[in-house]
Regions:
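Polytopic transmembrane helical bundles with strong interfacial aromatic enrichment
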Residues: 1-171
């Protein structure tokens, strides 16, 4: 496999896409299945340490994992020659591979939007990065939590669509 070949770049970006996706969805599931249910059990005087030290670091990797995943996913689809067909869900092409990967891409795009434009702005209020009143912080906590739960639910069909394409056939 030549370094300049499309096959090499397809492999490289697909691998980065998988690693980034693990980083993103791993953090998503950590927040929803570990941190959120555990926070009420943490003594009140220790909670600020979690919000000040652990949460910002975890959110950094969560946010940028989402960005790397969507960018490398688009690159993989472009190099693989199925970007446009996947975006239109393979409609009119009778191509189940592009339909499945397209649904996965659209679900991933919705999740990415939630991370960058709903979860993170609200988490910044919770962490005190953005000025907010106590009522705004409570509302931001609820909105970020709801968007995070939506992403957790969307991650299951998204992962199914992304993985199942390998069994349907195609790149």
């Amino acid at each position: 496999m030549e370094l300049a070949s499309f096959d090499w770049w397809f492999f490289f970006f697909r691998w980065i896409h998988v690693i980034s996706g693990i980083m993103w969805i791993g953090h998503l599931w950590y927040f929803n299945f570990t941190q959120t249910p555990t926070m009420p059990k943490i003594p009140q005087e220790l909670r600020p340490a979690v919000v000040r030290y652990i949460l910002p670091e975890a959110l950094f990797w969560f946010r940028w994992g989402a960005m790397a995943t969507i960018i490398t996913g688009l690159i993989v689809a472009w190099i693989g020659g199925f970007l446009l067909s996947a975006i239109i869900l393979g409609i009119g092409q009778h191509n189940l591979h592009d339909t499945m990967i397209g649904f996965g891409m659209w679900l991933g795009a919705i999740m990415w939007f939630n991370v960058w434009f709903i979860i993170m702005p609200n988490q910044n209020k919770v962490m005190g990065v953005t000025q907010a009143t106590p009522d705004e912080v409570n509302a931001a906590r609820r909105v970020a939590g709801l968007a995070s739960r939506v992403n957790t639910l969307l991650s299951i069909p998204m992962l199914y669509c992304m993985v199942s394409l390998h069994y349907i056939g195609g790149p």
